[in-house]
Amino acid sequence: MPRKALIAKQQRKQKYRTREYNRCQRCGRARAYYRKFGLCRICLRELAHEGKIPGVKKASW
């Protein structure tokens, strides 16, 4: 769980565009972020197992 200061820092407008980075909308994690869902890998996995993300299911072959 990121500190509140890090989340506030990320939300501020950056002077340079390259300094901007994505955070998980659910937990605030900055690493392993999936743009398509706006979530980190951990939250994506949890929600997918609960069936809360339409069209996502566990692979089986």
From Swiss-Prot:
Record-linked SUPFAM superfamilies: Glucocorticoid receptor-like (DNA-binding domain) (SSF57716)
One of the protein's GO biological processes: translation
Pfam families documented for this protein: Ribosomal_S14
GO cellular component, one term: small ribosomal subunit
Binding residues annotated for Zn(2+), in chain numbering: 24, 27, 40, 43
Gene Ontology molecular function: rRNA binding; structural constituent of ribosome; zinc ion binding
PROSITE patterns (UniProt xref): RIBOSOMAL_S14 (PS00527)
Note on cofactor: Binds 1 zinc ion per subunit.
Keywords, ordered alphabetically: Metal-binding, Ribonucleoprotein, Ribosomal protein, RNA-binding, rRNA-binding, Zinc
Cofactor(s) named in the record: Zn(2+)
Role: Binds 16S rRNA, required for the assembly of 30S particles and may also be responsible for determining the conformation of the 16S rRNA at the A site.
Alphabetical list of HAMAP family matching this protein: Ribosomal_uS14_2_B
Similarity field: Belongs to the universal ribosomal protein uS14 family. Zinc-binding uS14 subfamily.
Quaternary structure and interacting proteins, as annotated: Part of the 30S ribosomal subunit. Contacts proteins S3 and S10.
Name by which UniProt lists this protein: Small ribosomal subunit protein uS14
